[in-house]
Amino acid sequence: KAKQTATGIACLNNNRQLMIAWNMFSTDNDGRTIYASAWYYPGFEYPSGLKYEPTADFSWCATQYQGDGSLKDWLEISALFPYTGKNRDVFHCPEDKNISLAKERGWPERVRSYSMNIYAGGWSGWPFKGDQMWKIYRQQSDFRDPANRFVLMDMNDKSINAGNYRVHMAGWPNNPKLYRFQQDWPASWHNNGCSFSFADGHAERKKWLHDDTINITSDPQARNVVISPDNPDIAWMQDRATRPNPGWQQQNWVLQWTGAMHLKPWQWWGYWRMPGEVPADSLSPKPTYAD
């Protein structure tokens, strides 16, 4: 128990150090927040010879990086890496012993345990798929209540992927029967708890209360929806992830197919709703636009 307490404290300290780096990046970039994800995939060539989204240079984590020992170590691509003093240790929770594929590839441990709230910076600055109605915090000044907007969290090793954690907002604020997980699950290695850091710089641990949060019941990579009605953990994350974006329907976002995102160099590269995907706004009651 004493060892778990010590590793839990170390994890919270990692979160605080990463938030210092996060704020330093914003200071150097006119108050902009770093992107939660971008695509970096050398095996795929975009038009004009680009092998990655230009926004990868401004992303917390680039590419479909599982964090489990890919052939290339993507950690140093992170735009936060130099702001941590190139300290690799702060990206890894000492309680994260679940190395999965890394062990098969000869790695002693996964190099990244944390993922970033997709709404804190977005995928290259944009909402992911059907999330157009939800606010993306692109500037530090966008956070009206920074102490209650999480930025980083421990992510389950079976679902850690492209750098971000997407809280599914279906059911917010008052229809808990629609709560669900899809692809992304939080970690629970801190005695069924998870570390979070927030936009004001503080870090805290959340103790999970529901079995669906602790035990993954579907292959995350299959992107299946797991309905988890009345799950208080989902309610807790939704309350701290984002809020509706007023006037989102009037912002003229082109709803492009995800797979065509590389065909045109938009100001921000990113994901839009795929054909046939159920939009998030149809899953929730009409929200109030509170901060």
What residues fall within each predicted segment?
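C-terminal juxtamembrane segment of a hydrophobic transmembrane alpha-helix
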Residues: K1-T5
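Short, well-structured segments within or immediately adjacent to enzyme catalytic domains
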Residues: T7, C11-D291
